[in-house]
Amino acid sequence: MGKGTVVLAYSGGLDTSICIPLLKEEYGYDRVVTVAADVGQRKEEISIAEEKGKRFADKHYTLDLIDQFVDRCLMPSIKANGLYEGYPMGTSLARPVIAEAVVEIAKKEDATAVAHGCTGKGNDQLRFDVVFRAADLEVIAPIRERNMTREWEIGYAEKHGIPVPVDKEKPWSVDENLWSRSIEGGKLEDPAFHPPEEIYAWTVSPLKAPDEPQVLSITFEAGIPVALDGKRMKGADLIRTVGQIAGGHGIGRNDMMENRVLGIKAREIYEHPAANVLLTAHADLERLVLTREEYAFKQSVDAKWAQLAYYGLIYEPLWDALNAFIDTTQKRVNGTVDVRLFKGSVTVLGRSSPDSFYSIDVASFDSTTIDQTDAIGYSMYYGLQARLVRKKQKK
């Protein structure tokens, strides 16, 4: 007697495709239900996953999670200036949303287990596991559990008639969603290897970008981008539009050595044109409307938020507390930021906000609004403790 139904998070790639027969042959499940999530990747990718899921699995679901991804993950990331080790997160933000959708299908299908095709070296295994286990479901990860090699996987796929297009000359792995596109593997694993231009799909080379700059005007309400050049747009549409424009100017490439959750260093290459522009504009607007103390403290909160997001710890109570603080600060992050896009760079040209407490009368060198002699007394005691210690050290 078999083990019933298992629901598999499915991308249509090599790893998740071979999991379908493996879950039956090696794990003894009667039914394998696949779930492909649309989080803004290319439509061709979704179509391939749907076609293969319907062909090889007992049942297949394709779920449109784009709006959910935008509202639950991307907009909060903008409000938190979501950068991990200096780059905009994308994959890490999408995984929990996908995992939660898989859990819902597992409940619907009365499944006894859920599965994913993650390896034992990456971060995604942990992001899926934490959501799956929170739902009290058995978690199966065939690739991780059986320590498979790429060569073995290809052979197994061929044996089961699973078409897997793998180019040995270009064996890099690509993951994309509405916010970012990551490229890794193959020759790219050598940190000294110069990546060929052909790996990029969202951005033109800054060297070949237009010789004329383009200016965008981005309007924010409560920290969320709501309009582009004065035209209000739905979140997903605004992100797509900004991404297409910015990518055409060579903006959003990042080639870096990344510290994974397990401590492994990995060479990762990213494209995130919309993220670069929107995060730059948002951070600049915060400098206009937040107080010095708010701004300084929020930087530490943003860093912790990014770490928890990268680690996939969205059920950590601290996550809710950080989001509550961030939401409070964003009430005044309203206004418009003008940015110039030119050959790979994003430059803020100007910003305005009805919630700004900036006063040109106070800040101007030509203003007499503030009596400068008032600062004399303050200056006398500024750094007092440091001066006293310095004097003692000189004795």
From Swiss-Prot:
One of its GO terms (cellular component) is cytoplasm. GO terms for biological process: argininosuccinate metabolic process; L-arginine biosynthetic process; urea cycle. It catalyses: L-citrulline + L-aspartate + ATP = 2-(N(omega)-L-arginino)succinate + AMP + diphosphate + H(+). L-aspartate binds at residues 119, 123-124. Keywords: Amino-acid biosynthesis, Arginine biosynthesis, ATP-binding, Cytoplasm, Ligase, Nucleotide-binding. Its EC number is 6.3.4.5. ATP binds at residues 9-17, 37, 117. Pathway: Amino-acid biosynthesis; L-arginine biosynthesis; L-arginine from L-ornithine and carbamoyl phosphate: step 2/3. One of its GO terms (molecular function) is ATP binding. Transmembrane segments: none annotated. The keyword Ribonucleoprotein does not apply. Its main location: cytoplasm. L-citrulline binds at residues 87, 92, 123, 127, 173, 182, 258, 270. It is found in: Cytoplasm. Homotetramer. Belongs to the argininosuccinate synthase family. Type 1 subfamily. This is Argininosuccinate synthase. It comes from Methanospirillum hungatei JF-1 (strain ATCC 27890 / DSM 864 / NBRC 100397 / JF-1). The gene is argG.
